[in-house]
Amino acid sequence: MPVSKHMVVYPYFILLLILIAAAILRVVGIDFGLPMAYHNDEPVLVLACQQFFSGDFNPHNFLYPSLLMYFMHAVQRIYFVLAGGPVDLTMLYLLSRLTVAAFGIGCVIFVFLLGKKLAGSTAGLAAALLLSLSPLHVIHSHYATTDVPLSFFVLWSIYQALNLEERGRWCDYILTGLAAGLTVSIKIPGAAVFVPILIAHLIRIQRLEKMNLLRQCQEYYRRWPARSVLFLLPTFTATAAYLFFKHFAWFADRLLRRIPVDLWQTYHDEIVSHLAAAAGKYALLFGGGLLLIVFIWPIWRVRLGRLFTLFAAAVVAFFASTPYAIIDFKQFAHDFLFQMVVSQTTWSGTFADKAPALVTNFGYLLGDFGPVFLFFVVLAAARAIIQKDVPLFLFFSFGLFYYFYLGTWKLMFDRYMVPLLPILAVLAAIGFVWAAVELASFLCAKWRIPRWCTYGILTLLLFMPPAVGMGKEAVDFDRYLLKKNTRTLAFEWATANLPRQAKILREQYAPEIEIDGFDVINVNFMFNDSVDADYVYKNKIDYLIVTDKLWSRPMQEDGVVQPRSAYQRIVDYADLLWSIAPTPANPGPEIHIYRIRYPDPK
């Protein structure tokens, strides 16, 4: 049957409409809160971009790698060159958010391409529509943070891995390595993309060499039994890793002399306790990984040069886009350790009332996609395994590994699930399309019901209701951003009523009145027992600003979950001066402003 021009153009016209809807959902309200940053991770990136205008391109902060900062700065440079005028912090925030929104729209495009590659244009369009409406994806596309850009680079890496599995050219290995390296340079957990990449490499070799993977490996070791001694390596590695992390306190002092990072001293107990508790996990990770490498070594050694080239390209891409990880290694090591080790202990009280990470994270995904679409996700994954659909299995292998890896974390922010949303969108679309085709074929053969009738009914009954629900949640969030937040109202009151010469202490969710010239101490999550009357008297604090976003969270000290008693003691040394609670018209946190009550001099 000849393909008409209209049949080729039609899907791209629908995609254009979806992209317009995705852009509207991600741009409406994007200037919320400015000149304040309502998301506490935004200043990490935006203030680094501001510093770049001075000519110093060292971010001096490696809580995240640097690639996204440089992307944002490039956009900001272009804008200020064209628009002229001084560098304005408010505009830096807005441009940074727009950069992330653009990555969010790019994710929708990649989802269409991947869906089309795996199951045709209909699945690609359905996947693009689902991701464009995803509430969690829409929410985090408004923030100048790393999660949505990470999703974009994850999709690019998976797309390249599929090309590697399909064609296996040298350029495919190089491009895949570059994509993976840049993914890690957005956010370290992006290293999970190496799972589908390695699977793609193994499948490619097995197909080209016409190998039976299991039989080839068995034959390799049966022919030369002495090679079986290699299996002692994983056992030794797992044992050594377990003993090292379990007794890390013994190594800590020696490591401190070798790697003089002050974090070892400041958070010595937290690091030791975390690594000791995770000794079994690390032993399983190192031992299991090496066992897999040893067992399938007969496959690894084929075309090993191409695999090394891929990893070399990844390393070059990472350090080219995060160059100060080498130049300023001490700061990089400090922040990397803090992000991957210390933050897993000091913030764990925040999630003390949550279920384990695997359950909590599943709840985030269920709340975003709903049970119907998650059913189609499971259907597509099961079908891929049963029918040995290699490309589709390769595609969702990232999602499986990433989900279970983050299931070992104590931090359970919903934003950590953002890279899984495109994976779920594609799987849900493929599962729905497959179910619709199979059911339509059955009904057409048995009762001669027209296929278009079955497609229409299934779309109206099973696809549209949950999709409309997702879209409504996304629109509700945009409407939320358009309302005047309690932080903005508190900012306006404080800047109009507090003395300019006053010294103010605020916790991290309180309005950022320092941008209006006030002398402010920001104590972030450390607003715990260290903040008391002696602390405020010693630092000559005049006013205190706190919110229920932090005082309502428990904290964890020495493994014991307890309320933040520092907030309960505020009334012992301060008087409530002003407060505001959220309303439907003015959402946001409850905010209290206190005046410090100094004792009468004797």
PLM features: what roles do these ranges have?
Residues 431, 456-484, 506, 512-513, ...:
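Transmembrane alpha-helical segments
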Residues 110-113, 149-166, 172-180, 197, ...:
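Specific aromatic-rich, kink-prone transmembrane helix
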Residues 3-7, 116-118, 122, 157-173, ...:
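Membrane-interface transmembrane helices that cradle and orient dolichyl/undecaprenyl
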Residues 12, 18, 84-87, 106, ...:
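Transmembrane-helix signature of polytopic, membrane-embedded enzymes
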Residues 531-534, 538-602:
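Aromatic/acidic, Gly/Pro-rich catalytic loop(s) in extracytoplasmic/lumenal soluble domains
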Residues 25, 45, 64, 70-71, ...:
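Transmembrane-lumen/periplasm boundary regions of multi-pass, lipid-linked membrane glycan transferases
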Residues 20-23, 90, 94, 98-118, ...:
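Transmembrane-helix motifs of polytopic, lipid-linked glycan transferases
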Residues 140-141, 147-150, 183-188, 192-195, ...:
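Hydrophobic/aromatic-rich transmembrane helices and adjacent perimembrane loops
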